[in-house]
Amino acid sequence: MTDLSHPNPQFSAADAEKLAIEVFGVTATASPLDSERDRNFRLETGTDADWILKIVNASEPQVESEFQTALLHHLSNADAKLAVPQLKPSLSGDVLASAVATGGERHAMRLVGWLPGVPLAEVKRTFELMRNLGRSLGELDHALQGFIHPGAVRELDWDLRHAGRARTRLHFVRDADRRALLERFIVRFENHVAPKLSRLRAQVIHNDANDWNVLVSKGDHEQIAGLIDFGDAVHTVLIAEVAIACAYSILDMEDPIGAAAALAAGFHEKYPLKAEEIDLLFDLIAMRLVTSVTFSASRHDKTDDNPYLAISEAPAWRLLEKMDAMNPRFATAILRKACGFDAIEGAGAVRKWIADNSKTFAPIVRPAPATMTKALVPYGDATHFMTVASAEQRAKEATEWWDNFCAENNVQLGIGPWGEKRTVYTDTAFESRFIEGQRRIHHLGVDLFMPAGTPLYTPLAATVVSVEIEREPLGYGGLVKLEHRPEGCPPFVTLWGHMAHEALGRLKPGQKLKAGDLVGHMGDIHENGGWTPHLHFEMTTDINLTATEILGVGEAAYLDVWADVFPDVAALAGIPPETFHQDGRTRAEIIAKRKEILLPNLSISYSEPIKFVRGDGTWLID
């Protein structure tokens, strides 16, 4: 392993020009390039054939220098689609030459082709660029599959399997809050990630696809032109390639996890990832950043004049702070969904089981919702009086309007549908943790509006997980969480929000409920978070979430993810699909069509013809 404290090779630009002509037969003008531990020079020949002279740190073992040379040679023969530096043999035919510094130290040396392009760090990042980067890295690693060399199996602090070593550098971080932030990521790594790494696929990877090593096309900044600097290549877990590329390429993006998901999806397209690899990706992205900032902190007193080491430190801290505010389970759900997996393992099976068994559920209210007259609550209309009054926490006025509407229109049950876009969520608590400047405005449960005190019953056998009170304005008020484990279905959880507080004294964690048993009652304004009385009914396929971690509303960009994590619960609540949409002709269109094609002697039995909306077995449903 290279000793990072060993000084860089001591060669000047003039020395580089002399070595280029004497060893490689290349006449060129040399200019130094930033490097963490080696000495690199760009050699400009005045033609299109420019070169990079890499003089290796004397502390790097010979076998590691030979490994990098063998790797580049392998890629040149593998016809990898991603452009990588091409080796130029010395005049004596060696691709790995040597040079002696003025102090007498001998250094390995190689000459590689200069790749045209613009560093990723200097262009605007888009999801399409991230996806193309993922594709390019997937093609590269697919080409490296099966390649091995003795120098690839080495101790390297930048190997993400050893990211926990960052703990030994924490004391160099002077700010206490930042140390605590890093500690949280390290603890997660030690407890939840490190024990699983040995079971993942491993191979040789580039291991440093940072935004200065990735080149994009000068003419099209969404196309990848090449990848340089294989100095950190190592045999390690495959998913580290994706994590490292994400850590640098998503810096300062408005939606960093969305960008990471695009990159992972591109990689998956060319070199399919496994679910257990994606499950660790969020933490591995964070730990690459933790490794970077702790190394920078440990070297501040020695390397303040080396811009390479601190080049991404400030953006790295910003990204770490964003990631610290995210729920890792939701971030992982986004990454899984982007690669074609269920956002939560088993989510698809839960949704199918509910659809297949919807006729067997006990009614959540009595009489059953399907038999009641229903109307959609106008929360989807941003300008409606009830919406505005609710957002301004004038719940009594909103309730009065709704009660009057129900009385005038004979409405027994009000419905707030899943996925509905709403502007009623005005509190800062609804700001997105994932997308900068956006809010969570799409409803992820189903609301049932009935008078305060209405009894509510579980549609399935359940175990009480928690009963609590959320007292924040526009919060849930009384909150009950039940777990269901029906035969033939993965377990899932239902959430019952805006409940009366009486449930707190009646239900206990671990208590068993049979289908049709009482859960609680709809809470009044003073105990339900300050809302018109209703039940927020929701389910989640992630049984590890606490009641308060379950999102009631989500971002538009991730509705497909939330549909897995928090599926539409309407069928479980017994609300028929025609409540939300009806297909086919209107009643007036049907009458007109009947008059057109039926003889006058074929009478219509009803003064107002029935509009049938669907069939169900032998029944027609109007």
List the predicted regions and their residue ranges.
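An alpha-helical support segment within catalytic cores of ATP-dependent transferases
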Residues: Q10-A20, H149, R165-N207, S217-G219
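Active-site activation/catalytic loop segments of kinase-like enzymes and analogous catalytic loops
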Residues: I239-P272, A286-T303
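ATP/Mg2+ or Mg2+-diphosphate-binding catalytic cores
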Residues: L4, H171-F172, S292-A347
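A conserved alpha-helical element in kinase catalytic cores
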Residues: I55-R106, E122-K124, E128-R131
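Active-site-adjacent loop/helix segments that line or gate small-molecule/cofactor pockets in enzymes
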Residues: D583-R614
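A cross-family kinase active-site recognition segment
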Residues: L91, E122-D177, L200-A202
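Zn2+-dependent peptidoglycan hydrolase active-site motif and core
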Residues: T458-A503
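Polar/charged, compositionally biased leader and regulatory segments
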Residues: G340-D447, Y558-Q582
